[in-house]
Amino acid sequence: MEQKPSTLDPLSEPEDTRWLDGKRKRKSSQCLVKSSMSGYIPSYLDKDEQCVVCGDKATGYHYRCITCAGCKGFFRRTIQKNLHPTYSCKYDGCCVIDKITRNQCQLCRFKKCISVGMAMDLVLYDSKRVAKRKLIEENRERRRKEEMIKSLQHRPNPSAEEWELIHVVTEAHRSTNAQGSHWKQKRKFLPEDIGQSPMASMPDGDKVDLEAFSEFTKIITPAITRVVDFAKKLPMFSELPCEDQIILLKGCCMEIMSLRAAVRYDPEGGTLTLSGEMAVKREQLKNGGLRVVSDAIFDLGKSLSAFNLDDTEVALLQAVLLMSSDRTGLICVEKIEKCQETYLLAFEHYINYRKHNIPHFWPKLLMKVTDLRMIRACHASRFLHMKVECPTELFPPLFLEV
């Protein structure tokens, strides 16, 4: 008995009908795209889905049909350049089109494209394609900005406890930061002739203007004292053993003093204001003994000027520098680490509250901690050279301690 083909058997239908009437499977894959050895495959395609024109591996939904990249390009070029009227067939338009024969007859290939449903009206000419791409890019940029604004709106602001901590840290900074917000009006400029004539030779070949060095050492003791006072006003710091307090202060003192100088960078005059009172130029600070450290602090000042930090942000950054659990010799490492995490979290939430316009503001600001660490390391190396050559009486005792 002859077996009739089942109507449910897709092989019993004509090839073109199967491609036209068959429903496309759309899988909810775990990732947005499927990758294979042959390249990019959109998530809505089956792994081995074939081009409805030639049977080659399909790459996507092109001009209303699932096709390969080759047939997509052939169809687009044919329409854009109006080539189809010039096509002809040697075999009365009866060629079978597959991935082997598709390049042998342009007319039959084009007829196959039309018969399976590829839409001529969807092909854009060059000017329209450029306009479409521009529109896509504009929409993408708009969505990116909207998502960024949305993410900023959903970032947490400080809690009530964090606001209390932020207030304490800010007041500690303001009460120990010389001249406060009036530093520009109260600063005094180091005379031009000081720091311009290097005199004493150093072991590494550099020279130091001892007059400039002497001026700097006059303000170093009160600057260190203010950093110590700042630390003592922080409740978490005062709860630590005295041994740990000393180690933390020695570790952060140069970092905090450098930060306080850097945020008082004046781009118009090209000066830094040290200890809130002495405005110096780059060359003066260099010749006064700091050399490469001078460049690092000035460069930090220039970069920080774009951040427009307020007193609270400077204060919290100082607290983060102070509570560094990686200082050598600490006893209560875990406690100090938790203290720093508390400051960091309050700091991050305050940054969210401030809503800065600089992209990636928070991670960029944290990178300044690394810069300040490098300044401290350079200063320590420089100080060893200076101790050898400069008279010991020029160094204040407290400066020698830290």
From Swiss-Prot:
Presence of keyword Phosphoprotein: yes
Record's function text: Nuclear hormone receptor that can act as a repressor or activator of transcription. High affinity receptor for thyroid hormones, including triiodothyronine and thyroxine.
Gene3D superfamilies documented for this protein: Erythroid Transcription Factor GATA-1, subunit A, Retinoid X Receptor
GO BP of this protein: cell differentiation; negative regulation of transcription by RNA polymerase II; positive regulation of transcription by RNA polymerase II; retinoic acid receptor signaling pathway; thyroid hormone receptor signaling pathway
Name this protein carries in UniProt: Thyroid hormone receptor alpha
DNA-binding interval(s): 51-125
Listed GO MF terms: nuclear receptor activity; RNA polymerase II cis-regulatory region sequence-specific DNA binding; thyroid hormone binding; zinc ion binding
Region annotation (Disordered) ranges: 1-22
Highest classification ranks of the organism: Eukaryota, Metazoa, Chordata, Craniata, Vertebrata
Cellular compartments per GO CC: RNA polymerase II transcription regulator complex
Assembly with partners or alone: Probably interacts with SFPQ.
InterPro entries named among the record's database cross-references: NHR-like_dom_sf, Nucl_hrmn_rcpt_lig-bd, Nuclear_hormone_rcpt_NR1, Nuclear_hrmn_rcpt, ThyrH_rcpt, Znf_hrmn_rcpt, Znf_NHR/GATA
Keyword line: DNA-binding, Metal-binding, Nucleus, Phosphoprotein, Receptor, Transcription, Transcription regulation, Zinc, Zinc-finger
Positions that bind Zn(2+) 2: 89, 95, 105, 108
Organism whose genome encodes this protein: Pygoscelis adeliae (Adelie penguin)
Domain notes: Composed of three domains: a modulating N-terminal domain, a DNA-binding domain and a C-terminal ligand-binding domain.
Predominant subcellular localization, coarse grouping: nucleus
Start and end residues of each NR LBD domain: 161-402
Family listed: Belongs to the nuclear hormone receptor family. NR1 subfamily.
Chain positions found as Phosphoserine: 12, 28
PANTHER family attached to this UniProt entry: NUCLEAR HORMONE RECEPTOR, THYROID HORMONE RECEPTOR ALPHA
Cross-referenced Pfam families: Hormone_recep, zf-C4
